[in-house]
Amino acid sequence: MCIRDSTSGFPNLLIFSLQQSGFTVNFPHALDEQSKHAAYILRHVLDHDVRTFEVTQAAEDAWVETILELAQFNLDFLESCTPGYYNNEGKPSARGVRNGFYGGGSVQFFQVIADWRAKGDLPGLELLTG
């Protein structure tokens, strides 16, 4: 499931960001993948006369849990590297971990969003028609 580009309580919102997504030094590639994802969602809602779409709280919570689980792979690195901006001066915070990158890397993240689209029914989004 991938609901990282929306947030509960903000209908019809799509977010393009590095937070909770696959970090890559080739930023245009990340934008391209996120654009494909957004275009798929928008095409679906237009084709199905959806008036509003919004991520469910349960789906958002599940995605944040995924981010936190995968962040553990990076936590040792953040705690042991030279203090600086990216590790809160050597003290990684829960907020920083939650708002970090998808811990499986960009290739895995792009596959996750492709697999989500392949399901075809926008799981985790509440769709209101009319």
Task: Pin down the residues of each PLM region.
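A structural motif
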Residues: D5-I15
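C-terminal, flexible cofactor-proximal segment of oxidoreductases
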Residues: L14-G130
